[in-house]
């Protein structure tokens, strides 16, 4: 019988979750947690999400990239800390585009308001 590491368990839990809570630090120094739909994960170190270029969380992360992230499923939960990078790369935006984003970004993958 093999025993999974905490990192393996956390990775599996993250894969099951559709929504995570991402917390930025606002200009007053307070945490600002928001629910976010995850697009793609690479282990537990890279988690892709989309948002608006002018959203409060984007503004927060551009001035302070420190973040908290938590996710849970059926009583199991994980809380992580790290840094957020706001990505505007057109190739990545196209690659990670999902049809339901059109409601938020009517210009499609090239909409200047769409960032990762």
Task: Report residues per predicted region.
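Charged, gly/pro-rich active-site loop segments
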Residues: 1-2, 79-116
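Short, positively charged
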Residues: 1-5, 57-58
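Onset of an N-terminal alpha helix
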Residues: 3-11, 15
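A short, Trp-centered hydrophobic/proline-enriched beta-strand micro-motif
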Residues: 12-27, 67-70
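Short glycine-rich loop/turn motifs
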Residues: 19, 33-36
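General beta-strand recognition
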Residues: 21, 46-48, 79
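Residue-level signal for well-ordered, solvent-exposed loop/turn and beta-edge residues enriched
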Residues: 28-30, 83
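A short mixed-secondary-structure module that forms the rim of ligand-binding clefts
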Residues: 39-75
């Amino acid at each position: 019988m093999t025993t999974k590491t905490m990192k393996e368990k956390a990775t599996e839990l993250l894969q099951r979750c559709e929504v995570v809570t991402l917390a930025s630090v606002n200009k007053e120094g307070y945490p600002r947690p928001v629910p976010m739909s995850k697009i793609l994960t690479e282990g537990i170190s890279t988690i892709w999400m989309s948002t608006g270029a002018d959203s409060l969380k984007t503004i927060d992360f551009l001035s302070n990239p420190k973040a908290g992230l938590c996710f849970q499923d059926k009583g199991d939960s994980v809380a992580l800390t790290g840094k957020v990078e706001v990505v505007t790369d057109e190739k990545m935006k196209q690659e990670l585009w999902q049809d339901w984003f059109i409601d938020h970004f009517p210009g499609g993958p090239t909409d200047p308001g769409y960032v990762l």
